[in-house]
Amino acid sequence: MSSQKKVSSGNTTPSGLAGLASPLNDQQINLLQQISDLSPQQLAWVSGYFWGLSQSAAPSAVTPIAQAVSAVAAKPAGKLTIIFASQTGNAKGVAEALEQEAKAEGIAVQLFDASDYKGKNLANETHVIIVASTNGEGEAPDNAIELHEFLQSKKAPKLPNLQYGVIGLGDSSYEFFCQTGKDFDSYLAKLGATPFIERVDCDVDYDASAAQWRKQALEKVKDALSAGVEADVVQLPVAQLAAGHALYTKQKPYAATLLTSQKITGRDSGKDVRHVEIDLAGSGITYQPGDALGVWFENSGELANQVLAKVGLSGVESVDVDGESLSIHSALVSKFEITSSNPQQVEKFAQLSGSKKLLKLVEEKDKLREYAGNTQLVDLLAEKQTKLTAEELVGLLRRLTPRLYSIASSQTEVDEEVHLTVGLVEYDVKGEKRFGGASGYLAQRLEEGEQVKVFVENNNNFKLPADDNVPVIMVGPGTGIAPFRSFIQERDNRGAEGKNWLFFGDRTFTQDFLYQVEWQKYLKSGLLTKLDVAFSRDQAEKVYVQQRILENAAQVWQWIQEGAYLYVCGDANRMAKDVHQAFVAVAEQEGKMSRGDAEEFINDLRKAKRYQRDVY
């Protein structure tokens, strides 16, 4: 692992040395001036460091520079260390908000990406907060795999002096809800650390619960972790502390313009996949290949009417949402999730309706999760006709959350645009069509020229290698092809010399070969070194991308030995697992390893960020 580094630091005015009686020579003063732009919190930390040196050394050994720094920042202070384990950026966003709020309270704080934090350093900490999302089936996010494993190992230090807090982010629709947060809580406790606040497990609509927990956590540590700078400490407002962060965020999205939503699957395809282009002109928004675009959407007004009819409401009834009075119809369209359900929602409605079917289902957790994952709200309400008040209906609902789409373009190619590859979620329930919320909005309801609220979600866990000479292997069936379109555009415009190999799969060659003309162009030019496709329904026996990887095992292994980076994007439940096992099989077969050693080899590639996944 590279040397530990901070993600960010505070912004404040430099502290001058004028007026200090200096025992330093000119060279030492010049050196000291290099710390003049540190924030009060950073100066407090430096002060503590030199104070520690002065306590461990004889009085005559105390250096003049330590004396000078102590004059600038009078006393040492404790600090709050925040570590985020994030896959898509949500945990990072919560951690950054916590960092800003801590600074506003005068608390010395430092923020780390989990991949940049050395676990052994926990022994030197006094107060740590871990913000953790969960990936796949209870797995740690890619950036936290090493820390997660370290804390379970025999190398992990005892932590009797550490106080900690954990906030988990997840989706209660899944079995392993907030599992990574639960893991970190358990591991730290077993190592002797003490929680200063109870862990919170936040659901999909986490903003309010996360904000409340952050406030409570800072109240508990504020007295112990004041900044410790007695003179000229300026308390900056949160808005100033956030300087340098993105102009547009989840909370403050940009009103972009839809340029086009074009179907790119064939007329006879069983899928409706759209190439979506959005205009960002004048916004100043930038993004990198591998990032995601957050899209805020509105629900279908027609679907809202169907929901209201199921519970006996007209739509004009008023409800209060964040202090704003809205009609229940408007609230369903713009404020709440109505194209999905979740286990808690099913349980609440079972109790309200008295449905025997649902009450029995609630007792069987696996079946409950499966039902909730495949049932829209309107179909849940149809299980038993039940009259509800507007407030009771709202009490069933989650807040609307934006959807994240892997960006399918590079700004080196498209400038002030962003492209997406959107698969329309579409299915029948008892003869009635059901559509996904965001995909239905982008593919059907939003007209060209209309505005759509968006923001960029950086994904540092899915990035091209910095060295343009490094080969890359990309596996992206279906709409998982999206980020690789951005990768290839980027490498093309950078003049990258590294080899590029794409594995793509879908149902049929004639109807579902997404961006076929572009891939053939890149293949002809030589930018795309190799293209292997798997169309599952073009022959009697289905073929998938993992089989193509195994068929090319010797060459895949050769590329890996040449330093190739591996990228996988798409379905997490089956495809990503099967592709992972294919890579393990390649290492076992071609590397002449045991199965266990092959697993370890592939996992080591992940830790080294040579094997990156964007799966969902």
Curated annotation (Swiss-Prot):
Binds 1 FAD per subunit. Binds 1 FMN per subunit. Its EC number is 1.8.1.2. GO terms for molecular function: flavin adenine dinucleotide binding; FMN binding; sulfite reductase (NADPH) activity. GO terms for biological process: cysteine biosynthetic process; hydrogen sulfide biosynthetic process; sulfate assimilation. Pathway: Sulfur metabolism; hydrogen sulfide biosynthesis; hydrogen sulfide from sulfite (NADPH route): step 1/1. Residues 251-465 form the FAD-binding FR-type domain. It is an enzyme of class 1 (oxidoreductase). NADP(+) binds at residues 536-537, 542-546, 578. It catalyses: hydrogen sulfide + 3 NADP(+) + 3 H2O = sulfite + 3 NADPH + 4 H(+). The keyword Transmembrane does not apply. FMN binds at residues 86-91, 133-136, 169-178. FAD binds at residues 339, 373, 403-406, 421-423, 427, 436-439, 616. One of its GO terms (cellular component) is cytosol. InterPro entries: CysJ, CysJ-like_FAD-binding, CysJ_Proteobact, FAD-bd_FR_type, Flavdoxin-like, Flavodoxin/NO_synth, Flavoprot_Pyr_Nucl_cyt_Rdtase, Flavoprotein-like_sf. Residues 80-218 form the Flavodoxin-like domain. The keyword Oxidoreductase applies. Component of the sulfite reductase complex that catalyzes the 6-electron reduction of sulfite to sulfide. This is one of several activities required for the biosynthesis of L-cysteine from sulfate. The flavoprotein component catalyzes the electron flow from NADPH -> FAD -> FMN to the hemoprotein component. NCBIfam families: cysJ (TIGR01931). Belongs to the NADPH-dependent sulphite reductase flavoprotein subunit CysJ family. Alpha(8)-beta(8). The alpha component is a flavoprotein, the beta component is a hemoprotein. This is Sulfite reductase [NADPH] flavoprotein alpha-component. The gene is cysJ.
